[in-house]
Amino acid sequence: MALNSDYQAFKNVVAARRSVYALNADLPVSEDDIVSVVKDLTELTPDAFNQKSARAIVVFGEKNREVWDAIYDAFDGKVDRAKTDAFAAGAGTVLYFIDRSIIQSMQEQYVLYADRFPVWAQQANGMLQFNIWSAFRSLGVGASLQHYNPVIDEAIREVTGAPASWELVAQAP
């Protein structure tokens, strides 16, 4: 049996997805396109009980620089400045969160599964990260996945205005 062209195209995108660390501010698509991709895939990525606990904030330009300066500062200089500067040199960053208020609501509504909702939320967030990263690859947008949290959580909240109920999961410069 021959696999169809849709599968082959999908497989090619997955196979080509890699961490890109040599970032710059030039995008092959508009910032609005990037935001649309993130919004669309946040809505379309499945999760248990359709809880929709995944959240994302996209920052560009000066706000991107503020995010990476805040990350550097949160570590009191214990991370390599060249590394955070390299991420800040990119066009933007996607910040991935889990909305804990959604999880709490689901736990109250479905008590028998209460201990599973945090696990399912992490799984769904991982799928979202993969979906967006792969979509970026298909658009020629380089990215990587970073995990400076929880050390940076409060600093990121201050820079972005993210609600206290949102738990930072990952950063994709």
Where are these regions (language model features)?
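A glycine-rich helix N-cap at a beta->alpha junction
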Residues: T84-F87, V159-P173
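Short acidic/His/Gly/Ser-rich catalytic and metal-binding motifs that mark active-site loops
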Residues: I102-Q107
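Small-aliphatic-rich amphipathic alpha-helix that forms the alpha element of a beta-alpha
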Residues: T42, Y110-E158
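Beta-hairpin (beta-strand-turn-beta-strand) motif
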Residues: G61, F97-S101
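Short Asp/Glu-rich motifs
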Residues: G61, A155-I156, A162
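N-terminal amphipathic, basic helical "cap/leader" segment at the start of enzyme domains
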Residues: M1-T93
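Active-site-flanking beta-strand signature of metal-NTP-handling nucleotidyl enzymes
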Residues: G92-F97, A172
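Short secondary-structure junction motifs
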Residues: Q51-A54, S138, G142, V169
